[in-house]
UniProtKB/Swiss-Prot annotation:
InterPro entries: Cys_synth, Cys_Synth/Cystath_Beta-Synth, CysK, P-phosphate_BS, TrpB-like_PALP, TrpB-like_PALP_sf. PROSITE patterns: CYS_SYNTHASE. Keywords: Amino-acid biosynthesis, Cysteine biosynthesis, Pyridoxal phosphate, Transferase. Belongs to the cysteine synthase/cystathionine beta-synthase family. GO terms for molecular function: cysteine synthase activity. One of its GO terms (biological process) is cysteine biosynthetic process from serine. Pathway: Amino-acid biosynthesis; L-cysteine biosynthesis; L-cysteine from L-serine: step 2/2. It comes from Flavobacterium sp. (strain K3-15 / DSM ID92-509). The modification N6-(pyridoxal phosphate)lysine is found at K42. The lineage of its organism: Bacteria, Pseudomonadati, Bacteroidota, Flavobacteriia, Flavobacteriales. It holds the Pfam family PALP. This is Cysteine synthase. SUPFAM superfamilies: Tryptophan synthase beta subunit-like PLP-dependent enzymes.
Amino acid sequence: MKFQNALETIGNTPVVKINNLFNSDHEIWIKLEKSNPGGSIKDRIALAMIEDAEAKGLLNKDSTIIEPTSGNTGIGLALVAAVKGYKLILVMPESMSIERRKIMEAYGAEFVLTPREKGMKGAIEKANELAEETPNSWIPRQFDNPANVKIHVETTAQEILQDFPEGLDYVITGVGTGGHITGIAKALKEKYPNLKVIAVEPELSPVLSGGSPAPHPLQGLGAGFVPSILDITLLDGVITVGKDEAYEYAINAAKKEGLFCGSFHRSRLSRYRKTFTGNTAWSKNSLPLITTPEKGIFLLRDSSKIL
C-alpha cells in the first residue's frame, strides 16, 4: 500500500479481539490507535487542527505553532509540523516522560517545561505567555478546539461504525482533552441508540467524578479540569483507575495478547475488569469496545514497576 507522505497514514486503525486476558462472557474488542505514525490517537487531532487553521488563514509558512501538551498531542503536532515545515514550540509539565520529549526533539520540536505541581493549567498559562511574545504564532488550543471533536466524528467514529455494523453495547475510553470521547459518542449514539459510553479518569484526580484535581502518574489521562469541548451529557458513567492496577494490566495484555500499549490502554483494561467481569448487571451477550490510544514504549520509563 503506497502513501504520498506520513500524514496519509493517520487513521484507519485496526480493531483486535481480546481472547486471553479476561474470564468473561463478553466479546471484547480493542481499537489500536497506537498504529498511527506518531504512535497515538493524537496524530488525528494534530493534523485536523493544523489543517483547520490553514483553511482559516491562521497559518503561513513563517508561522510558529505553540501548544501546551501532556505528551502525545505534542508528538502528533511535531510529526505534522515536520512534514508541513512549521516551527513548533511545545509546553508541558516537567512530570511528562523523558521518552516523549526525546521523540518530540527527534521531529525537530522545541519545548518548554513548567512546574509539575501546576499541571496542565500551568502549561496552558505559559503557552499563552509565549504566544504573546512570539510574532505570527498560533495556539491550537486542543482543549477548546472544535476541530478536535470534529475529526473523531468524521474519522474515528466512522471507522467504528464500519467495523461494527451490528452495533455496540459499551465504549470504554479515557478523557484527556475530551475530544475523542465526545466525538465518537456523538456519532455512535446516533446509530446505536442503546450504546453506553463509559469515561475513565485517574483516581488521584477524579474531576469528572466531582473530586479535586491533583498530580497523578497516568500521563495523558485527566487534565485536572473539565475541558470546554467535553460534552458530559453524552457520558453514561465515569469510573476511576489507580496506577498499580493499570500497570498490572499493561503487562498482562502484553504477555497474554501480544498487545503492548500505553497508559490509556492499561487504565481501560483494568476498568473493564472491575466494571464488567462478574457484574451481573451486564448482559452476557454485551459487546464492549475499548480504545487504546498509544504505544507501550511510553511505559518503559517505569519498566521496573511493571516487568
